[in-house]
Amino acid sequence: MAKYNEKELADTSKFLSFVLRHKPEAIGIVLDREGWADIDKLILCAQKAGKRLTRALLDTVVATSDKKRFSYSSDGRCIRAVQGHSTSQVAISFAEKTPPQFLYHGTASRFLDEIKKQGLIAGERHYVHLSADEATARKVGARHGSPVILTVKAQEMAKRGLPFWQAENGVWLTSTVAVEFLEW
């Protein structure tokens, strides 16, 4: 594997998140309903947009991503963001899964008043993202300011017929979490 510095890997990961989750049209690519993009087309369009992207750099980002944000298709010709989409081009069909008793959501303290009113909503994303452990939720919350960890009564939600899914990188997904299912 070629050597790249941390900044180059982080910048490339952010770029891939932007085009594979939110704005594929920004560089002129189209994602299929499951979020897949042709790798050759992605590289070509990224280069035309002034981004230094090669297959070797892509391979390194996919292989070293601590959160496993991206995956390759079984034939190695396509790539997608595992979850976190806001683009209407994508509607990944995750298999429904029974959650553990509790899941966790990391957020910043400045969002608490709104969450106490409306619960957790997906906002611009397709799903609310939840973590299986508090440590991961804390890291997520810290990205947005002083972190607060909310406990989600996931099994109670599931018993009431509210569905959960789990992305291939372990992130739990649900449509919304009402205030009654949150512990502060």
Swiss-Prot record:
Determine if Nucleus is one of this entry's keywords. no
Q: Which SUPFAM superfamilies match?
A: ADP-ribosylation (SSF56399)
Q: Which GO terms describe its biological process?
A: tRNA processing; tRNA splicing, via endonucleolytic cleavage and ligation
Keywords from the named record: NAD, Transferase
> Tell me, what is one Gene Ontology molecular-function annotation carried by this entry?
transferase activity, transferring phosphorus-containing groups
Quote the EC number.
Answer: 2.7.1.-
Mind telling me which InterPro entries this protein's record contains? Answer: Ptrans_KptA/Tpt1 (IPR002745), RNA_2'-PTrans_C (IPR042081), RNA_2'-PTrans_KptA (IPR022928), RNA_2'-PTrans_N (IPR042080)
| EC class name | transferase
Q: Does the keyword Transferase apply?
A: yes
Q: Which family does it belong to?
A: Belongs to the KptA/TPT1 family.
Described by its record, this protein's role is as follows: Removes the 2'-phosphate from RNA via an intermediate in which the phosphate is ADP-ribosylated by NAD followed by a presumed transesterification to release the RNA and generate ADP-ribose 1''-2''-cyclic phosphate (APPR>P). May function as an ADP-ribosylase.
Supply the HAMAP family for this chain: KptA
Name under which the protein is recorded:
RNA 2'-phosphotransferase
Organism of origin is: Escherichia coli (strain K12)
